[in-house]
UniProtKB/Swiss-Prot annotation:
The chain crosses the membrane at residues 40-60, 99-119, 131-151, 166-186, 221-241, 268-288. Part of the ABC transporter complex NgcEFG-MsiK involved in N,N'-diacetylchitobiose ((GlcNAc)2) uptake. Responsible for the translocation of the substrate across the membrane. Residues 95-288 form the ABC transmembrane type-1 domain. This is Diacetylchitobiose uptake system permease protein NgcG. It holds the Pfam family BPD_transp_1. GO terms for cellular component: plasma membrane. The keyword Electron transport does not apply. It comes from Streptomyces coelicolor (strain ATCC BAA-471 / A3(2) / M145). It is a multi-pass membrane protein. InterPro entries: MetI-like, MetI-like_sf. GO terms for biological process: transmembrane transport. Induction: Constitutively expressed. Slightly induced by GlcNAc, (GlcNAc)2 and chitin. Repressed by DasR. Belongs to the binding-protein-dependent transport system permease family. It is found in: Cell membrane.
Length: 302
């Protein structure tokens, strides 16, 4: 009797049958949800990857091969398509213009956005919330509504059809998002570190650049990548504000190259130009994708 009593579990440790059934049903539901989610992700990956692989494969074909056997491997790998796109279509010049404009705008917007977000997040002064909401409203302002005022404004300042004018326009439209993204990072930083820097003799500028800004490096990296992707693919602003062909960016050059070859299209060179346009974006995202995901989740929880 004592052995039976010892092996018998207390009533409080035994789960009712209904609870076990609910647990099994929940586990089964989770498995079904995971299976459906993975299937949808695989389908989405196929939809995205297959066209990209087709474009890459077609960039090494001749026009005849692309039209006769679009889904086969190239009979002869035509690397000269990239040379034709780079020189004959001036993709090389447009690529350099895009690098100059985007990198310059990115440096300015990251510096100004970080300073603005830091001041609004760490200092108390009259009108702070008003400035924050005005900057936030810039996220909802459609770009096309500002095209005409921007055109005349840049024309009055002598910045129309110039790289500095396009850079300043890029900065103006990327600044609200940068400030909004970095605001939560600076608010979450410990105030004791800032006070310790002041006690050690650092001024506000030195404390910002040498102490607080390095601590917000994950957020800075993520927002820099998002800004790079948006500015690199920008089309409407340069088309309206940068009509000088020598200063065209890559999106303008690609549109002009695709539309100029109406009847006699060199599809191989066209696909090569597309690859040249897309590769920088893919490289940036593939290299920094973990930092993007980590920074976004970190900023969300903060």
């Amino acid at each position: 009797m004592s052995v039976i009593a010892a092996d018998r579990k207390p009533a409080s440790d035994r789960k009712p049958v209904s609870d076990r059934k609910l647990a099994r049903a929940a586990a089964s539901s989770d498995r079904r949800f995971a299976a459906i989610s993975h299937a949808l992700l695989i389908l989405w990956s196929v939809i995205v990857i297959v066209p990209m692989l087709w474009v890459l494969m077609s960039s090494f074909k001749s026009t005849g091969e692309i039209l006769s056997s679009p889904f086969s491997l190239p009979d002869h790998w035509r690397f000269e398509n990239y040379a034709n796109a780079w020189t004959d279509a001036n993709i090389g010049k447009y690529f350099l213009n895009s690098v100059i404009v985007v990198v310059s705008a990115l440096i300015l917007v990251m510096l100004l956005g970080a300073m603005c977000a830091y001041v609004l997040a760490r200092f108390e002064f009259p009108g702070r919330r008003l400035i924050y909401y005005v900057m936030l409203a810039g996220l909802t302002f459609p770009v096309f509504l500002a095209i005409v005022p921007l055109f005349f404004q840049l024309q009055n300042f002598g910045l129309l059809n110039t790289r500095p004018g396009l850079i300043l326009t890029y900065v103006a439209f990327a600044l609200p998002f940068t400030m909004f993204f970095l605001y939560s990072f600076f608010r979450s930083l410990p105030h004791d570190v800032y006070e310790a820097a002041l006690i050690d003799g650092a001024g506000d500028w030195r404390a910002f650049f040498q102490v607080m800004l390095p601590m917000a490096r994950p957020g800075m990296a993520a927002v820099a990548i998002f800004n790079f992707l948006g500015l690199w693919n920008q089309f409407l602003l340069p088309v309206a504000l940068n009509t000088d062909q020598d200063k065209w960016v890559l999106t303008q050059g690609m549109a002009a190259y695709a539309s100029s070859q109406v009847y006699d299209i060199d599809y191989g060179a066209l696909f090569a130009a597309i690859v040249v346009t897309v590769v920088p974006v893919l490289l940036v995202y593939c290299v920094f994708q973990r930092r993007i995901a980590g920074s976004v989740s970190q900023g969300t929880f903060r």
